[in-house]
């Protein structure tokens, strides 16, 4: 059982009635990390779990193996939250993202400890948590600015104003990076919700601790239930359903498995779903953040607004 067994000193009664100290080994209680759906922390519908371990074989926690039913429940929660979240003022979405950064800062020590349990050095863990906090602040600042950057007023040869404005695409399903389990997770969640989308995230299978702890940060950060939903488990069991589910509008895959990429693209094409592949992205680097990641899950809406009597003489066009 590795470190799951720990020595404990106990008191026992000897034959003559006197207390004596004896030593025995007890089973350490591993925390069970639940999934996060609709602002709640349910257990997986399947009742299946796996034990997360590090490279030294130390058992860290019990992790839910999410099922297709869990994924469907998460999509329903994300769809129900979409109308309210996309209709919020962009400035308010920025405030909520900034609040997430504040709450992550308050629990910095916990996340550093969890990263170190998952084989990161202390220096690397401190750096990853700091970058994750800064990344949330970065996207909080973009919430009310990206539309001005990517929106346009188009010249047209008729008596109309013509505007093209980015709007959220809807429910986005994300297969998060397997490495960089915290900063990679934050770097895919933040631009998705900054643009008004809701999301369902499948966290890292091999390093899931920070992902589930991050859901506790989300739950205490004014994020409405259903805007962010975090599942844990095996990508090989769920990724195909990400692309085939008819109520998912876009899929983001962070990985280099060509088989998964091909199947996502084929199934996504079958129901006209946007499929985004982020391969070999160094998420802790500055290139891991950009307003163009917000644009990736936006649709450009063009509006024609009729006008009359323009020009000095009021003669129109």
Where would I find each of the regions flagged by the language model?
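C-terminal segments
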Residues: 2-16, 24-25, 134-149, 163, ...
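Hydrophobic/aromatic ligand-binding patch that stacks against planar heteroaromatic rings
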Residues: 190-193, 241, 267
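N-terminal Rossmann-like NAD(P)+-binding subdomain of aldehyde/semialdehyde dehydrogenases
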Residues: 2-160
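Periplasmic-binding protein-like
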Residues: 190, 250-254
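Conserved small-residue-rich beta-alpha loop and adjacent elements
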Residues: 55, 141-224
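Residue-level signal for inorganic ion chemistry
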Residues: 57, 93, 196, 228, ...
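Short acidic active-site motifs
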Residues: 124, 160, 237-238, 260
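A structured beta-alpha segment of the ubiquitous adenosine-cofactor-binding alpha/beta core
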Residues: 161-162, 230-246
